[in-house]
């Protein structure tokens, strides 16, 4: 995507804000953007012209196709977001909010492009982010302004992390754990984004182990174990099959994720055990600590006669980031257990290793613009709960994703390729049941009309918002397993 020189400069000098403004961020050179006293009409233009002159081809990045996934037209065509980008931007006579939205999109993409690649320039990135911080804040009235504020903050954090002069000055936003959990629960009430994966995976598990007396779930990333309470309730209340099915969960944790992650897994076990006791569900819980990202079945306690289920939730909100090599190690070893079911749930974010950072950035912007639009349809920006969720939960979520997509191309994969990887590495697809499809549609009926469920082959379901796919769930078994 190319940016005409004059058009790009004009993006900085709109009349939306006070021309004398500062931005709250720390630059890559070790000084705060708050220290800048910039006259946007004079000094700032000189800075941009100087940097662009020095960098030469900075504003002519390598040609990359903008994500046009799943037959979508443009980045987002919602009036609330004001975002509509395909291979360029129409400079007709858009409404004021739409015009500002287009400017913000171009500035975000320009900042992302300036921060990476062969022609990366920290100085140019710094001044673009300074302008963005002047134009937006998380408390603005439109979706696009608020979304741009979160992406600007995320890009600023990346700039700080990359600084070689002041790495010690970088600090991530830290929120009280109770606030984070509250925001997460509010998000679950606002959107089916998280519960879609939980619901479809749990239903598939119930169907797969219907006649099993002992069930062993190996959970790749248990987090708070939210989905397992509902599974226990269903096991206790079901009228068919063994009257007292024993459930055992093995939760993995990795030393690479730190002591906090290990403690969280242990606390999850205590909560699940207490809940199982309260409803009379036979239950046991094991914590499997891995010293590295590599997984070996020898680290598991296996009991003869148990039906093994593999649960793999990848990079959903509140889940820790795991490298592709870690996921491959886990799934490869899990295959040797001849699992009766493998549940795979992941976000539909395009992270193609053969595409550059700019492609991945645009697709991520597309993903979150759809999320913001879906939230707006159910809860207006004026609602304090919406602002709380955005500040405490969605902002850090955006920042974490930006960190992931800046990884070396060798460590970046398309999550859409995981089903293909399973099918070519000893797993077979399991058909989604009619009941599971109906339950997914019933879940969506509790929310706004823009959500939809799409079948992904015979063994998968996808949650979408209008034309954008958001989260997919697919179901598999070992080729050696008799169904």
Swiss-Prot record:
Expressed in seedlings, roots, leaves and flowers. Keywords: Nucleus, Transcription, Transcription regulation. Residues 102-165 are annotated as: Leucine repeat I (LRI). It is found in: Nucleus. Residues 267-299 are annotated as: Leucine repeat II (LRII). Residues 184-251 are annotated as: VHIID. Pfam families: GRAS. GO terms for cellular component: nucleus. Belongs to the GRAS family. Probable transcription factor involved in plant development. This is Scarecrow-like protein 26.
């Amino acid at each position: 995507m190319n940016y005409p020189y004059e058009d790009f400069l004009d993006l900085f000098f709109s009349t939306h804000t006070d021309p004398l403004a500062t931005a709250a961020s720390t630059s890559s050179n070790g000084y705060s953007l708050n220290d800048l006293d910039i006259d946007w009409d004079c000094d700032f233009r000189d800075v941009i012209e100087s940097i662009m002159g020095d960098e030469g081809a900075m504003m002519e990045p390598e040609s990359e196709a903008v994500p046009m996934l799943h037959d979508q037209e443009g980045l987002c065509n919602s009036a609330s977001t004001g975002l509509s980008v395909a291979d360029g931007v129409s400079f007709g006579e858009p409404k004021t909010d739409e015009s500002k939205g287009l400017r913000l999109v171009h500035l975000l993409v320009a900042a992302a492009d300036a921060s990476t690649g062969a022609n990366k320039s920290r100085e140019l990135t710094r001044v673009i982010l300074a302008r963005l911080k002047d134009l937006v804040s998380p408390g603005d009235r439109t979706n696009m302004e608020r979304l741009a504020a979160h992406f600007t903050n995320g890009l600023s954090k990346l700039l700080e992390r990359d600084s070689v002069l002041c790495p010690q000055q970088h600090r991530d936003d830290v929120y009280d754990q109770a606030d984070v959990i509250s925001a997460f629960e509010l998000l679950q009430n606002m959107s089916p984004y998280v519960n879609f994966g939980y619901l479809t995976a749990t239903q598939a598990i119930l169907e797969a182990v219907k006649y099993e007396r002992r069930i062993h779930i190996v959970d790749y990333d248990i987090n708070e174990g939210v989905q397992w309470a509902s599974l226990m309730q269903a096991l206790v209340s079901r009228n068919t099959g063994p009257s007292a099915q024993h459930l055992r969960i093995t939760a993995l944790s990795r030393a690479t994720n730190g002591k906090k992650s290990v403690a969280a897994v242990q606390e999850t076990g205590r909560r699940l055990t207490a809940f199982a006791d309260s409803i009379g569900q036979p239950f046991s819980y094991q914590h499997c600590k891995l010293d590295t990202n590599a997984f070996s079945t020898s680290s598991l306690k296996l009991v003869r006669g148990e039906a093994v289920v593999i649960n793999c939730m990848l990079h959903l909100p509140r889940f820790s980031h795991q490298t592709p090599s870690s996921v491959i190690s886990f799934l490869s070893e899990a295959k040797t257990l001849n699992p009766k079911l493998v549940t795979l749930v992941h976000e539909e974010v395009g992270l193609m290793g053969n595409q550059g950072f700019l492609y991945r950035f645009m697709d991520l912007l597309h993903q979150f613009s759809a999320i913001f639009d879906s939230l707006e349809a159910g809860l207006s920006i004026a609602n304090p709960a919406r602002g709380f969720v955005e500040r405490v939960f969605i902002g850090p979520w955006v920042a974490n994703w930006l960190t992931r997509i800046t990884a070396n191309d060798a460590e970046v994969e398309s999550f859409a390729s995981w089903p293909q990887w399973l099918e070519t590495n000893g797993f077979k697809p399991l058909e989604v049941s009619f009941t599971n499809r109906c339950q997914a549609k019933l879940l969506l009926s509790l929310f706004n009309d823009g959500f939809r469920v799409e079948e992904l082959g015979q063994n998968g379901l996808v949650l979408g918002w209008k034309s954008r796919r958001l989260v997919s769930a697919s179901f598999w078994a070992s080729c050696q397993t008799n169904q």
